[in-house]
Curated annotation (Swiss-Prot):
Organism: Azotobacter vinelandii (strain DJ / ATCC BAA-1303)
Protein name (record): Large ribosomal subunit protein uL2
PROSITE patterns for the chain: RIBOSOMAL_L2
UniProt KW keywords: Ribonucleoprotein, Ribosomal protein, RNA-binding, rRNA-binding
Organism lineage: Bacteria, Pseudomonadati, Pseudomonadota, Gammaproteobacteria, Pseudomonadales
Job description of the protein: One of the primary rRNA binding proteins. Required for association of the 30S and 50S subunits to form the 70S ribosome, for tRNA binding and peptide bond formation. It has been suggested to have peptidyltransferase activity; this is somewhat controversial. Makes several contacts with the 16S rRNA in the 70S ribosome.
Subunit structure and binding partners: Part of the 50S ribosomal subunit. Forms a bridge to the 30S subunit in the 70S ribosome.
InterPro entries linked to this entry: NA-bd_OB-fold, Rib_uL2_dom2, Ribosomal_uL2, Ribosomal_uL2_bac/org-type, Ribosomal_uL2_C, Ribosomal_uL2_CS, Ribosomal_uL2_dom3, Ribosomal_uL2_RNA-bd_dom
Length: 273
């Protein structure tokens, strides 16, 4: 992977920083694993905006990614690594020995031609998926399940990983990238290694239009609005808002705690930093 800084031949190119990966597949994706993806523009079935800053963007197909990795004991060959517009990580197309193909989140270091396998007795190798009880303590993992059989939910974005730091009884303890220490059932599965495309955070889109290509609309500051539109709005001249930061609906923001899931509080050994 190479980090390319564009020459400032125009204002729109001046701040562009690209991440170029020569190993990515340059052709079309695997058609049987594609689904139609329609855009909502951030509106619900009443036509009202439920999520701000969404609209436009390039048309996309959804890639059906296998988050369960439940095809046990059957070796698979990595056919190619592909770009996926729906996520920051790359995806890998696997061809199993019985002929079936599936997409998975591409682990770091896995290239076309590699052999991967999942199951209880899978070897300890990047890209293989095992139950947490069979993974050595200290291992770096990604794609971790929270409920056995539900599919990966933790550490799925570009460069993400977690570390298995302890095993006790029916649970293992994970250290997440946020600093949180969390208990997870040992029967849950995880994939060894970290997620690919860790250089994603180094890129710079360079101009507002590149955000619009991705379906992201502008964000207007509350202090630039009128009082009818935002709690921070109004005032003569420029103001600081006059109160602690809140959302357009008056809820505290910018650091205010929002977690309210008491049911799983006992699973968190240490809160995130």
């Amino acid at each position: 992977m190479a980090i390319v800084k564009c020459k400032p031949t125009s204002a729109g190119r001046r701040f562009v920083v690209k991440v170029v990966n020569q190993e990515l597949h340059k052709g079309a994706p695997y058609a049987p694993l594609l689904e139609k993806k329609s855009k909502s523009g951030g509106r619900n079935n009443n036509g009202r905006i439920t999520t701000r800053h969404i609209g436009g963007g390039h048309k996309q197909h959804y890639r059906l990614v296998d988050f369960r990795r439940n095809k046990d004991g059957i070796p698979a060959t990595v056919e190619r690594i592909e770009y996926d517009p729906n996520r920051t990580a790359h995806i890998a197309l696997l061809k199993y020995a019985d002929g079936e193909r599936r997409y998975i989140i591409a682990p770091k270091g896995v290239v076309a031609g590699d052999q991967l396998i999942s199951g209880v007795n899978a070897p300890i190798k990047a890209g293989n998926t095992l139950p947490l009880r069979n993974i050595p303590v200290g291992s770096t993992i990604h794609g971790v399940e929270l409920k056995p059989g539900k599919g990966a939910q933790i550490a799925r974005s570009a460069g993400a990983s977690a570390q298995l730091v302890a095993r006790e009884g029916a649970y293992v303890t994970l250290r997440l990238r946020s600093g949180e220490m969390r208990k997870v059932l040992a029967d849950c599965r995880a994939t060894l290694g970290e997620v690919s495309n860790s250089e994603h955070s180094l890129r710079s889109l360079g101009k507002a239009g590149a955000k619009r290509w991705r379906g992201v609309r502008p964000t207007v500051r509350g202090v630039a609005m009128n009082p009818v539109d935002h709690p921070h709005g109004g005032g003569e001249g420029r103001t600081s808002g006059g109160r602690h930061p809140v959302s357009p609906w008056g809820f505290p923001t910018k650091g205010a705690k929002t977690r309210s899931n008491k049911r799983t509080d006992n699973m968190i050994v240490r809160r995130r930093k």
